[in-house]
Design a protein with these regions (language model features):
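Residue-level detector of alpha-helical secondary structure
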Residues: 53, 57, 61, 65, ...
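Acidic, low-complexity, intrinsically disordered interaction modules
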Residues: 13-62
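Negatively charged, low-complexity tracts enriched in Asp/Glu with abundant Ser/Thr
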Residues: 1-12
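Short intrinsically disordered terminal tails
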Residues: 1-2, 80-84
Length: 84
């Protein structure tokens, strides 16, 4: 089982269809790191329990798509190039 999963936001994208947010979820932690062009390496969003974290994911599950680490790096590179 993978310890870290990455999900891109499919609703909020820029004009080139790149996501404006990526969610980094680590299996054993009660936080989700939210990556965006202002926080390329991520900023933590804490939960009171793994259950509340999983509930958050269930709420947004229709608007996210799982990506692999290579796609994450590609998106981060795009954000770095296009920061204004």
């Amino acid at each position: 089982m993978e310890n870290t999963l990455y999900f891109k936001d499919t609703i909020h994208c820029d004009q080139n269809n790149y996501p404006k947010k990526i969610y980094k979820v680590e299996y054993s932690k009660m936080l989700i790191e939210i990556l965006d062009s202002d926080h390329i390496q991520g900023r933590p969003f804490y939960f009171s329990s793994p259950h509340s974290r999983d509930d958050f994911i269930k709420q947004i599950k229709d608007h996210i798509l799982r990506i692999n680490y290579e796609e994450l790096e590609q998106i981060q590179h795009y954000w770095k190039k296009n920061i204004k």
